[in-house]
């Protein structure tokens, strides 16, 4: 697709030497990415943004950007944790197609020194993700979603 601006794939988590490819979190992310699997429609802003209304289902290391089409700098965010989610939502509003290949083409290692764990400990992750949900939902709905979403933080323990 010559108008592709973002390409992403599924991934396998490597945690304490074990490969994880079918836990609940990964299945939820696959479901959230479904709108990006329709090539006849995945160039529409509303459909691209639909993939992000219940969280960021995209693993940044499993993502490639068409920098020439997006311009520089193509990453612009004030966030330190939710910057990928914030940036992808912004890019979804730009012309171009988001392509998702659900084959797991990346192994993603979760480890003790991961930035994600630090952001959970200092509450940065919660604050930034709540702000992102408030972009899509009224605050009471965002708080309900965060109640469920926060349970996924245990995946990093």
Where are these regions (language model features)?
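Short, internal active-site loops enriched in acidic
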Residues: 12-13, 113, 154
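Conserved nucleotide-sugar donor-binding catalytic segment
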Residues: 9, 22, 27-126
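Short beta-strand-to-loop element that shapes/binds the nucleotide-sugar donor at the catalytic cleft/hinge
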Residues: 7-20
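Juxtacatalytic substrate-recognition/specificity segment
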Residues: 134
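TPR/TPR-like (Sel1-like) alpha-helical repeat modules
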Residues: 137-138
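Non-catalytic, C-terminal membrane-associated alpha-helical segments of glycosyltransferases
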Residues: 120-130, 146-157
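Conserved donor-nucleotide/metal-binding helix-loop-beta segment in metal-dependent transferases, i.e.
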Residues: 1-5
């Amino acid at each position: 697709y010559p108008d592709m601006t973002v390409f992403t794939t599924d991934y396998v988590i490597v945690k304490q030497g074990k490969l994880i490819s079918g836990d609940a979190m990964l299945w939820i992310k696959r479901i959230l990415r479904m709108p990006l699997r329709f090539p006849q429609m995945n160039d529409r802003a509303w459909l691209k943004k639909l993939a992000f209304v219940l969280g960021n289902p995209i693993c940044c290391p499993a993502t490639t950007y068409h920098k020439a089409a997006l311009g520089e700098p193509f990453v612009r965010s004030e966030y330190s944790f939710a910057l990928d989610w914030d940036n992808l939502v912004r890019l979804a509003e730009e012309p171009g197609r988001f392509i998702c290949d659900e084959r797991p083409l990346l192994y993603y290692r979760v480890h003790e020194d991961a930035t994600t764990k630090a952001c959970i400990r200092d509450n940065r992750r919660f604050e930034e993700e709540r702000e992102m949900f408030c972009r899509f939902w009224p605050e009471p709905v965002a708080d309900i979603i965060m109640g469920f979403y926060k349970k996924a933080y245990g995946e990093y323990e």
